[in-house]
From Swiss-Prot:
This is 4-coumarate:CoA ligase 1. The gene is 4CL1. Mostly expressed in flower organs, with highest levels in corollas, and, to a lesser extent, in tubes, sepals, pistils, stamen and ovaries. Also present at low levels in leaves. Pathway: Phenylpropanoid metabolism; trans-cinnamate biosynthesis; Phytoalexin biosynthesis; 3,4',5-trihydroxystilbene biosynthesis; 3,4',5-trihydroxystilbene from trans-4-coumarate: step 1/2. One of its GO terms (biological process) is cinnamic acid metabolic process. Optimum pH is 8.5 with cinnamic acid as a substrate. Catalyzes the formation of CoA esters of trans-cinnamic acid, 4-coumaric acid, ferulic acid, benzoic acid and caffeic acid. It comes from Petunia hybrida (Petunia).
Length: 544
């Protein structure tokens, strides 16, 4: 049955194949996540992969409330912002959930940012307190001192800093009585900045409750998880994909969340085997490492039943390789964007009652939401199988960009549609295929060349372990596609061999004109290729 309707404006709107469900949007995020805690209060909630310490659901809920009281004691009030500058750790969870109980906002920053980047975000978000680790204190010390901010450390606190235990030892009954509105902001991630400057994305209690429910609630949940599951949390929690689809979804269903501080293939496999991990939310770089590393074969990974990856091209051969490594897993993709809360589409093979899916699709629009595909030039909605800009509407999308109404208006139109800047199409089976970023298309004499398509081809070559394609200026064509390629271990593949491999498979204007061999392809924490860095290298004339 086709899930599409036409509106009075002539818009063709696509919906999930799953029926809409009741979503308790009135609940604050913490109340929603812990709503069914009585069913699993003594079960493991967080497992710290670094030291094997296990926190039960009762521990996590109580500690989060203690942290809320502790933050309040330090002067943090409702609608204030705290900055969490941490790698994955139980304290990250306690800080985020604690702020929610208080009606405060968490802005999450990558601890590997430069001091200037951290300070920029702390300033822009008006953070009133910073939670970090001793090794990162130097990045914020001067700013915190100049602005009279408390810095809290989760490990040995240097002079002038407060130890995290001061928060966890507070009396949970001291949380002030706050009335949280569903439209209040709870999380303030900064969008990746792959286009323009990073901006604070205001995600509300209602938005995140809706997004989690769209994934894991309902009789036939789109992303089926339960309290017997063990989720691998290796993606950084400061990124919304991990925060939402791993932490918040995991808490909602009562699953055990196994926290890994950073990806290391050996430790990763050891933890999967030891704790019998069942669900693996990954990004393409991790999928690539799993598929191409011989180490993986030494471990029993048969417990994994779900492997989901972000919507970047994996390529058919890569998918097949992952299937061999995880013999019992369903492999599929989701599609997200920070501003959309972040999940727009989710693979229906992950549903409790699964659907058949096609290789390369990145899911079907989530339930309780609407999607349309529009012509980027005219704004008119397009029928099935025609690529255009993906737009989404629903309660899960951001409230807007912090202090940037102009950027908000450019992104969310008057009808409430969020314009993603991604190009894709919906096929006859309601599956979404991403063609590319609107802003990343290469224009060869007016022909559109999608980098993602060429990258998928390159990744299928056995002697290529990673690749990125970007435009290079060309006098005659305007732009031509060039590739940055990482050779597989021991390979001595040449530029001509790479070019020939691609040219046999594509139309003339998609042929790669130059190949630059590099050690690594630069990527954001969420796994997106940092194309602007590669373009800058080309412009500077130093491609390698």
């Amino acid at each position: 049955m086709p899930m599409e309707t036409e509106t009075n404006q002539g818009d063709l709107i696509f919906r999930s194949k799953l029926p809409d469900i009741y979503i308790p949007k009135h609940l604050p995020l913490h109340s929603y996540c812990f709503e069914n805690i009585s069913e699993f209060s003594s079960r493991p909630c967080l497992i710290n992969g670094a030291n094997n310490h296990i926190y039960t659901y009762a521990d996590v809920e109580l500690t989060s409330r203690k942290v809320a009281a502790g933050l309040n004691k330090l002067g943090i009030q409702q609608k204030d912002t705290i900055m969490i500058l941490l790698p994955n750790s139980p304290e990250f969870v306690f800080a985020f959930m604690g702020a929610s109980y208080l009606g405060a906002i968490s802005t999450m920053a990558n601890p590997l940012f430069t001091p200037a980047e951290v300070v920029k975000q702390a300033k822009a978000s008006n953070a009133k307190l910073i939670i970090t680790q001793a090794c990162f204190v130097n990045k914020v010390k001067d700013y915190a001192f100049d602005n009279n901010l408390n810095v809290i450390c989760i490990d040995s606190a240097p002079e002038g800093c407060i130890h995290f235990s001061e928060l966890t030892q507070a009396d949970e009954h001291d949380i002030p009585d706050v009335k949280i509105q569903s439209d209040d902001v709870v999380a303030l991630p900064y969008s990746s900045g792959t286009t323009g400057l990073p901006k604070g994305v205001m995600l509300t209690h209602k938005g995140l409750v809706t997004s989690v429910a769209q994934q894991v609630d309902g009789e036939n949940a789109n992303l089926y998880m339960h309290s017997e599951d063990v989720l691998m949390c290796v993606l950084p929690l400061f990124h919304i994909y991990s925060l939402n689809s791993v932490l918040l979804c995991g808490l909602r269903v009562g699953a055990a969340i196994l926290i890994m501080q950073k990806f290391d293939i050996v430790q990763f496999c050891e933890l999967i085997e030891k704790y019998k991990v069942t669900i693996g939310p990954f990004v393409p770089p991790i999928v690539l490492a799993i598929a191409k590393s011989p180490v993986v074969d030494n471990y029993d990974l048969s417990s994994v039943r779900t492997v989901m990856s972000g919507a970047a091209p994996l390529g058919k051969e890569l998918e097949d390789a992952v299937r061999i490594k995880f013999p019992n897993a369903k492999l599929g993709q989701g599609y997200g964007m920070t501003e959309a809360g972040p999940v727009l589409a989710m693979c229906l093979a992950f549903a409790k009652e699964p659907f058949d899916i096609k290789s390369g699709a990145c899911g079907t629009v989530v339930r309780n939401a609407e999607m349309k595909i529009v012509d980027p030039d005219t704004g008119c909605s397009l029928p099935r199988n025609q690529p255009g800009e993906i737009c989404i509407r629903g309660d899960q999308i951001m409230k807007g960009y912090l202090n940037d109404p102009a950027a908000t208006t450019r992104t969310i139109d008057k009808e409430g549609w969020l314009h993603t800047g991604d190009i894709g199409y919906i096929d006859n089976d309601d599956e979404l295929f991403i063609v590319d970023r609107l802003k990343e298309l290469i224009k060869y004499k007016g022909f559109q060349v999608a980098p993602a398509e060429l990258e998928a081809l390159l990744l299928n070559h056995p002697n290529i372990s990673d690749a990125a394609v970007v435009p290079m200026k060309d006098e005659q064509a305007g732009e031509v596609p060039v590739a940055f390629v990482v050779r597989s271990n021991g390979s001595d593949i040449t530029e001509d061999e790479v070019k020939d491999f691609v040219s046999k498979q594509v139309i003339f204007y998609k042929r790669i004109k130059r190949v630059f061999f590099v050690e690594t392809v630069p990527k954001s924490p969420s796994g997106k290729i940092l194309r602007k860095d590669l373009r800058a290298r080309l412009a500077a004339g130093v491609p390698n």
